[in-house]
Amino acid sequence: MRKTLMAGLAAALCIGLAGSASAQQADSRLYRVTKAGVLRMCMWPLYYSISMRDPKTGELVGIDADLSKELARDMGVKLEVVETSFGTFIADLQANKCEIGMFGVGATMKRAQAVEFSHPYLVTNVYAVLRDGGPIKDWADIDKKGVNVAVTLGSYIEPFMRGYLKNATLTPVAPPATSQAELMSRRADIIMTDFPSALRMTKEFEGTKFLLPPEKLAVTPYAYVVPQGDQVWLNYVNLWVDTIKLDGRLAAAAARHGLGPIVAQ
């Protein structure tokens, strides 16, 4: 009798778990995206080598511009780009404006309180970019009174620099303005940024160079970002990131856009 009762309870539990798993899958963004045939992807269109809109063609160019198309193709759906920024992407995800953010988002502990991150695909740290002939000669010149340091508003570098700088003035720059423009117009003495943005400055703006700190600062993984509470969707995105690492698509896309040195292993 006891064995019969336990067997019955186990069977009921299995049925309940199966039903719960089935309901979870049906409610997942993975199911909804494949059913609708459209993947809405949040992207900041001002990120060099990551997701930069070409002013001549209007097309998005960069590693995530390429890889977002790969994800949509692997899912068998169309890609719909939803423009966002570092200051608004969390609210956009929470408001269900997109299923995923793909634009070099730094996976920080603070952001992880509001969204979930995939396995990392890039890893970078803080770089300083300055003008030749400016007041900054080496790293020790940065944190001094009278020095204006520009950062992108909402970037992971902004809160780090707030804690790091003791004497210099920190100026967060909100889109559509850019920290690069602040530097070149001499409103800023130096900008704090990541590898992709430092790469852009030294390639596109004559008379600029970047400085590395004596030791790496704010080493941060870049990952894809999804809303909280959808483990099925997050599992799929994680598997996809692992897949493009193994099949070479991540390395190839990074190499096309000069990001080979910061590919996550």
Regions found by a protein language model. Name each.
Residues 122-132, 195, 199-242, 260-265:
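Periplasmic-binding protein-like
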Residues 87-88, 104-113, 160-163, 184, ...:
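A ligand-binding cleft/hinge motif common to bilobed small-molecule-binding domains
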Residues 39-40, 76-78, 84, 94-103, ...:
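Alpha-to-beta junction loops
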Residues 66-74, 140, 152-155, 221-261:
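Extended ligand-binding regions for polar small-molecule ligands
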Residues 65, 69, 73, 78-141, ...:
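Acidic, polar ligand-binding/catalytic clefts
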Residues 24-28, 156-173, 210-212, 242-265:
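Ligand-binding clefts/hinges and TM-proximal coupling segments of bilobed small-molecule sensing domains
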Residues 24-104, 256:
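Extracytoplasmic small-molecule ligand-binding "clamshell" domains
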Residues 36-43, 140-154, 169:
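Short loop->beta-strand "edge-of-pocket" segments that line small-molecule binding or catalytic clefts
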